[in-house]
A protein has these predicted regions:
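Generic structural signal for well-ordered alpha-helices
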Residues: 60-64, 90, 164-165, 237
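The conserved 3'-phosphoadenosine-5'-phosphosulfate
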Residues: 165-253
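Short, surface-exposed basic-aromatic patches at helix termini and helix-loop junctions that form
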Residues: 93-95, 197
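Surface-exposed cleft-lining segments at the edges of enzyme active sites
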Residues: 81, 142-156, 212-225
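Distinct, well-ordered alpha-helical segments
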Residues: 88-93, 191
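Short, conserved clusters of charged catalytic residues that mark active-site
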Residues: 12, 58, 85-88, 159-162, ...
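Acidic, metal-coordinating catalytic cores used for nucleic-acid/nucleotide bond scission
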Residues: 81-85, 156-157, 183-187
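PAPS-dependent sulfotransferase catalytic core
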Residues: 1-85, 95-100, 105, 109-145, ...
């Protein structure tokens, strides 16, 4: 039998760039199941948000070493949700491969903020209660190292409009697919088919759902917190609706 010649990955074909706590782990799972995709040896490689990597001549082999030899038709992807939020990442990715495709999942920013805080509490990294944390966020992240700042950026990560705008400054609209988390969750098969089509691939023949790795919630978000956050996000949600042609009424109070 003839063996297909395998090649070394020299450029990634796509990246799942965000947003954190918006279904990216599940999307990574389904992408990795596709026979024509490799997602490398780990989720969240964090190459393009590592300032030390870009302080001198960039060695992209440090990225590509995470990928096996692949068939000519295999696409290589990464899933690092912090890239959407980390300001230098878009330009760094464009310099690396201006033809790359980007996938972005966006969740109701109010729910995303609470899920983010809950994850930090679960990991033992967050001493503050949620309302205290979101009210003190600006002070906490001001001047903090990037890794620490984004760890506690519960609100700031939810201002999606300017983050998506930053991607579109570098990449053409047909190379950036933005998906609502709620649609991905409720219409998973159809949404996945659309994502694979965007990548130029056939859909998976069968879609077995990923077992959810649910972090138990310490408590529920109260109404005061929900109103406070929605008032912060309302203008940005409206801007996102206009930019993407979305209906985000399910994100509103």
């Amino acid at each position: 039998m003839f063996q297909t010649r395998r090649r070394k990955v020299e450029r990634l074909d796509f990246i799942v760039a965000g947003a954190q706590k918006s279904g990216t782990t599940a999307l990574h799972y389904f992408l990795a199941k596709h026979p024509n995709i490799t997602m490398g040896d780990q989720q969240e490689i964090h190459f393009f948000d590592d300032d030390a990597t870009f302080a001198a001549t960039v060695d992209y082999e440090r990225l590509h070493k995470h990928y096996p030899l692949v068939a000519p038709s295999t696409m290589a992807g990464d899933c690092t949700p912090s890239y959407l939020y980390f300001k230098p990442a878009a330009e760094r990715i464009w310099n690396y491969n201006p033809k790359i495709k980007l996938l972005v999942l966006l969740r109701n920013p109010v729910e995303r903020a609470f899920a983010h805080w809950n994850m930090q509490r679960f990991k033992g990294r967050e001493p503050l209660d949620f309302f205290d944390a979101i009210r003190e966020e600006k002070t906490r992240i001001a001047g903090a190292p990037p890794t620490e700042a984004r760890r506690f950026a519960y609100v700031d990560r939810g201002f999606y409009a300017h983050q998506v705008e930053r991607l579109l400054k570098f990449f053409p609209r047909d190379h950036v697919k933005v998906v609502k988390f709620e649609e991905f969750k409720d219409k998973q098969r159809e949404t996945l088919a659309s994502i694979f089509s965007f990548l130029g691939l056939e859909p998976l023949r069968s879609v077995r759902g990923k077992d959810r790795n649910v972090v138990p919630y310490e408590r529920a978000m109260n109404w005061e917190e929900r109103i406070f956050l929605y008032n912060l996000f309302a203008n940005d949600i409206a801007k996102l609706e206009q930019m993407l042609g979305w209906d985000c009424s399910d994100w509103k109070l």
